[in-house]
Structure formats: structure tokens, C-alpha cells
């Protein structure tokens, strides 16, 4: 199963393919119902994404050809999509805010493309009402509103730049700083060639495989790309300059940096402390064990088809020669997200700006490969930071990085299930105390993979097959974790700002006594805009711009719940090292007891948890 690797370069590039993130939401959020919809009591209650309908749309031409097709052809697709979305809202009482944000955000994109500017304020208001994080609530719909006013008032780019500066300057900087900087980075990477190349080399391939009957979401992607190319790209410089003016003014005023409440909570174990070695498992995409003290067994690995492999660190293959450049691009992406004008950031912008459509697939796949190559080592560095007694064991999954997914089959899922059992057994054999899992997936991932390969007679059949395959792996993973009560497993919740419960993520959605699921905050202790939530998300830790190791030893900052969960694994490993007699239940209890609750956030406090055990730091 593929992993949602936390590689900001990839996410920044992908943002340019989303349904106009610059216009719709930048982040999107319960609306009452579609106009004319049935009363709530008469609508079907939806508590899981599995309950929602799946649809396909028959295209008359390749998706890429719609990028330059007559507007009337795209409007016909948009009308069909809008009718289906409004029918769903009339029929279903959807209990998940993130899913509702998707619906309303799509309607907003459609309204903008159709030029229905009068509908924009109401849709923006509905999105804001669905957003429970202060930063996204403040920024949601800002650009959609500006563009609507620009279009109706026939304003020029200079007006847009000034409005961007004024409206973002009026926001609470503590709430919106990270989002504004990230949004500026997304805008700087806008490139129509990137969109065209992604369509031609990836989306068109899927459409051909599916004999032109594509998932309905592809229509939204087409409309979003047209809207982006026609309305957003011409305003790129104005928006970037306006946002930069806001950032510059905040830095000049001295309030550009948030207060750091995270670092003072941390503690380090001295090399001469009275402590015992503790085995820490990193179940991930591979670890450069040369950077760490490994356990005796070192690790176990499985390839893209879940067959045993000897590669504990993912090979770069033909991309090895490009590693220095890829490393620069990864660093540049992080600098761009932080709105830093560095040489690495400039190189990334130059690389994206000069991309030709035929180069996009290789470029994106190499970045994806680099992400998987670096992810596990970065996670491991966080998990053992400040703990000289930690010994690392890697469980390496060589997930697919190419755009063409592995074809899901029952045989593959049963091999995956068996691999999960073997991996956990290896943890037991190595007597590990803590295992970090910075990955998750749900049944919907298999639906997309099955669709790519045109497996299943229709979307509903694909949905059922996906759930059957997913259930094989879900049950095996749950049983494997439950079979090791002496090991504390720690999982990242996800980076989709959605409900792990609604999406049925594993392992994040498991409720087991030896598992902790972790969401992400920044150094100020504020929930990040991307962090997934849910009933099983019981702890939070810093997952924003966390510095750690890359293979080879360089250090870089990554963001994601992938960076938050190893912070909890780090604390657990330190407690086990200092008091090896502790049980999983005791460590779990003291971590939870030491955490500080503020609304939905339950932020760990490593020092407090240690002190609750009587440890003198």
C-alpha cells in the first residue's frame, strides 16, 4: 500500500493541480442543505465515506484536451457535476465537515468558472462555517472573494495586489502566518505547463485505461485547471507581491515569529545517565542505519509487490546521480513554504518555471522517490533525538513512487497481510519497546488504484472490491498490533484536515490499548491546518517544520503528522530507557496524564510526564 509521504516539494507542486486552491478555499469547511433539499430528518445520515455514491462520467475526449477545448464543452461537464453534487446534498445528511468542505468547495469552483459571482459570498460563508481551525477559517475564501470583486468590477492586477495586502494584513497573524507563507509558496510554483504535463502523462493514461469513463472527480479537476489557468495564473505576480508585502510588514514589526512553547518541554538523556538500551522500530519507507545505532537484527524489508527485500534503505536507482539536485529541491520547498528567499528556494522556482509538459511526469516521480527515500530516515532522527540509549530497527516498505499504481489483487492483499504479521513478529524477536508508524490509508486508496487499472464493471463494484481487499489488510494489521501488547505503537493521524473515523484510516483509526494516534501542532502548540482529527487522535505533538536527518546526514525541516508521531515515540523510548521496568500501559498513562488539553488539542509535555514518574531531569 502506498504511503502519503510528507514531502513538501511534492505537496506544493500538487497544489497547482488541485481545484483552484488559490480561489476556492486555500483550505475549505456544515451547510444546512442544498436549496430545495429535503429536511434533515428525511435525508440519509452519512457517517462514513463508504456510504457516499461513486459515479463515473463518460468523456468525449482526453482530459488534457479539455484544457483548451471550447468553453461550452467544459461548461456542459460542469453542469453535470453541479447537478450531482446538489442532488447528494439534498439526499444525504453528511456528518463530516471535511467532506462537506469538499462539496461546497467544488460548488464554489464551479460557480467561479461559470462566472456566477453572485453565488460566491454565500458559498464562502458556508465554507467558513465548516472550518473549526482559526487560521483556515480566517483565510478561507479570501481569494475567491477578491477575484469575484475583480471580475464584477473589472479591476486590474494592481487593485488585486492592494486588496491581497489589505485583507491579509487585517488578519490575526498568529492564526494565519503559516498558511499565508505556504499559500505564497504555492502561488510561486503555478505553471500551466505543470498542469498540462500532469494531465497528458498521468490523467490521460487513466482515462484511456478506463475507456474514457472516468471518476467524477476528474471533471472537478478539469474545471479547476481551466479556472486556474484562466483567472489565477494572470494574477500570480499580483498575489505573490501582495502576500510578500504582508510578510515583510510583519517581520519589520517584529511579530512574524510565533512563541515557542514546544522546545522548553523537551529533555535529553545524558550519555552517562543510568539508563538501559531501548529498541525503537521505524515502520516506514526505509532508514539510513549508518546514521544511528541499530539493533542486532537491523531490519526487515518488503518491495513494491510486498515480497521480501534486502534493501533496508530505499535505492534511488537511476535517480542516484540526481540526488544532490533533488536534495536541493526538497530543501527549497521547505524554504518556500516558510517564505524564505534562499538559493535553494530560487532553484526550485526556476526548476518548476522552466518545466516542459513532457518533463513533468519524470520530475514529479523523482520528487516522489526522493520523498520516500528521505521520509523514514527523517522520522527515525526525530524518534531518537536526545536519546543515546535508543537502538533503531527498520521495517521498510518500498512503496510505489511512480504515477502508475500497482494493480490491487486479493493475492497482493494477502501477501500484505502476511507481511504485517512477519513485521510485528520481528519487532517481538528484537524485543522492541516502541514502534513508530508515520503512514496510514483507507479503502478509498484502493478504489483509485482499481479505477486506474479499470478493474470492476462499475464504481459500486470497485468500491465493494476495494473494501474486501482493505478488510484483509486492516484485520491483519489490527491483529498483528494487538498480538504485541508489550510494544507501544505510535501512529500519525494524517495530513488531510479530515476525520480519521470518517475515512476509516488504518492504523490511525484503531482503538487498541498499545496504540497512540497523534495529530500535529506547531511550536506554539496550535493545531496545524493539515492535521487529521478523530476519536482515536488522543495526543498532539510538534509536526511543523521539524528539523531532522536525511540519508547521508544532512539536516532539513519537514512538516506533517509524520513528524509529530515520532515525537511521542521519542518520549516513550526515553521513559522506557530511564525506567525499563515500565509497562506499555504505564507509559501510555503517564504520557496522557502529562499532556495538556486545550480544546481538541492534547499536547504532550515530555518533562511533565517524566516528572510524574519521579525522574529528575
Predicted regions and their residues:
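Subtilisin-like serine protease catalytic core
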Residues: 265-415, 430, 512-514, 524-526, ...
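Substrate-binding/access-modulating region of protease and related hydrolase catalytic domains
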Residues: 366, 400-506, 554-559, 563-565
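Extracellular S/T/G-rich loop segment that most often corresponds to the catalytic His/Ser-adjacent loop
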Residues: 486, 492, 500-577, 581
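Residue at a conserved register position within TPR or TPR-like alpha-solenoid repeats
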Residues: 104, 111-114
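N-terminal domain-start motif of subtilase-like serine proteases
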Residues: 149-164, 248-282, 287-296, 362-372, ...
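Hydrolase catalytic cores
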Residues: 177-209, 397, 543-607
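Subtilisin-like peptidase catalytic core
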Residues: 63-70, 112, 159, 163, ...
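Helix-turn-helix repeat elements of alpha-solenoid scaffolds
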Residues: 71-87
Amino acid at each position: 500500500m502506498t504511503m502519503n509521504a510528507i514531502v513538501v516539494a511534492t505537496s506544493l507542486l500538487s497544489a497547482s493541480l488541485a481545484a483552484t486552491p488559490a480561489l476556492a478555499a486555500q483550505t475549505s469547511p456544515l451547510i444546512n442543505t442544498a436549496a430545495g433539499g429535503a429536511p434533515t430528518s428525511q435525508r440519509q445520515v452519512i457517517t462514513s465515506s463508504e456510504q457516499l455514491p461513486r459515479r463515473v462520467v463518460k468523456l468525449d475526449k482526453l482530459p488534457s484536451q479539455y484544457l483548451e477545448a471550447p468553453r461550452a464543452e467544459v461548461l456542459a461537464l460542469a453542469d453535470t457535476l453541479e447537478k450531482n453534487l446538489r442532488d447528494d446534498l439534498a439526499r444525504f445528511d453528511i456528518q463530516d465537515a471535511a467532506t462537506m468542505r469538499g462539496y461546497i468547495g467544488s460548488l464554489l469552483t464551479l460557480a467561479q468558472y461559470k462566472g456566477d459571482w453572485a453565488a460566491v459570498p454565500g458559498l464562502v460563508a458556508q465554507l467558513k462555517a465548516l472550518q473549526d481551525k482559526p487560521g483556515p477559517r480566517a483565510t478561507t475564501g479570501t481569494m475567491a472573494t477578491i477575484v469575484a470583486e475583480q471580475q464584477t468590477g473589472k479591476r486590474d492586477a494592481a487593485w488585486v495586489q492592494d486588496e491581497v495586502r489589505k485583507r491579509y494584513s487585517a488578519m490575526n497573524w498568529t492564526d494565519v502566518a503559516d498558511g499565508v507563507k505556504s499559500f505564497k509558496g504555492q502561488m510561486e510554483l503555478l505553471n500551466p505547463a505543470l498542469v498540462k504535463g500532469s494531465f497528458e502523462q498521468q490523467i490521460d493514461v487513466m482515462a484511456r485505461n478506463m475507456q474514457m469513463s472516468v471518476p467524477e472527480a476528474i471533471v472537478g479537476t478539469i474545471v479547476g485547471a481551466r479556472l486556474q489557468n484562466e483567472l489565477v495564473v494572470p494574477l500570480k505576480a499580483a498575489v505573490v507581491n501582495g502576500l510578500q508585502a504582508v510578510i515583510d510588514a510583519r517581520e519589520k514589526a517584529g511579530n512574524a515569529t510565533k512563541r515557542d512553547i514546544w522546545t522548553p518541554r523537551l529533555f535529553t538523556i545524558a550519555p552517562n545517565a543510568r539508563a538501559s538500551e531501548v529498541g525503537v522500530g521505524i515502520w516506514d519507507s526505509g532508514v539510513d542505519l549508518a546514521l544511528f545505532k541499530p539493533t542486532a537484527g537491523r531490519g526487515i524489508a518488503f518491495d513494491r509487490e510486498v515480497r521480501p527485500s534486502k534493501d533496508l534503505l530505499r535505492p534511488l536507482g537511476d535517480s542516484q546521480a540526481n540526488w544532490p539536485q533533488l536534495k536541493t529541491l526538497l530543501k527549497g520547498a521547505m524554504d518556500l513554504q516558510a517564505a524564505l528567499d534562499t538559493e535553494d528556494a530560487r532553484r526550485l522556482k526556476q526548476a518548476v518555471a522552466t518545466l516542459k509538459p513532457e518533463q513533468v511526469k519524470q520530475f514529479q516521480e523523482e520528487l516522489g522517490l526522493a520523498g520516500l527515500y528521505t521520509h523514514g530516515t527523517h522520522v527515525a532522527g526525530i524518534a531518537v533525538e536526545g536519546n543515546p540509549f535508543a537502538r533503531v530497527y527498520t521495517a521498510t516498505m518500498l512503496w510505489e513512487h511512480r504515477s502508475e499504481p500497482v494493480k490491487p489483487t486479493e493475492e497482493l492483499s494477502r501477501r500484505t497481510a502476511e507481511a504485517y504479521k512477519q513485521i510485528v513478529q520481528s519487532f517481538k524477536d528484537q524485543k522492541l519497546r516502541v514502534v513508530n508508524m508515520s503512514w496510514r490509508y483507507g479503502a478509498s486508496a484502493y478504489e483509485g488504484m482499481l479505477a486506474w487499472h479499470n478493474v470492476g464493471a462499475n464504481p459500486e463494484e470497485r468500491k465493494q472490491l476495494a473494501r474486501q481487499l482493505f478488510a484483509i489488510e486492516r484485520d491483519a494489521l489490527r491483529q498483528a498490533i494487538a498480538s504485541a501488547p508489550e510494544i507501544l505503537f505510535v501512529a500519525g493521524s494524517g495530513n488531510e484536515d479530515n476525520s480519521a473515523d470518517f475515512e476509516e484510516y488504518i492504523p490511525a483509526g484503531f482503538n487498541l490499548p498499545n496504540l497512540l494516534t497523534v495529530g500535529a501542532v506547531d511550536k506554539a502548540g496550535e493545531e496545524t491546518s493539515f492535521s487529521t482529527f478523530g476519536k482515536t487522535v488522543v495526543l498532539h505533538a510538534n509536526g511543523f517544520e521539524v528539523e531532522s536527518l536525511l540519508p547521508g546526514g544532512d539536516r532539513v525541516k519537514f512538516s506533517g503528522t509524520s513528524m509529530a508521531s515520532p515525537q511521542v515515540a521519542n518520549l516513550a523510548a526515553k521513559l522506557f530507557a530511564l525506567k525499563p521496568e515500565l509497562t506499555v500501559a504505564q507509559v501510555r498513562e503517564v504520557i496522557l496524564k502529562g499532556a495538556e488539553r486545550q480544546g481538541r488539542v492534547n499536547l504532550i509535555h515530555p518533562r511533565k510526564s517524566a516528572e510524574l514518574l519521579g525522574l529528575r531531569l
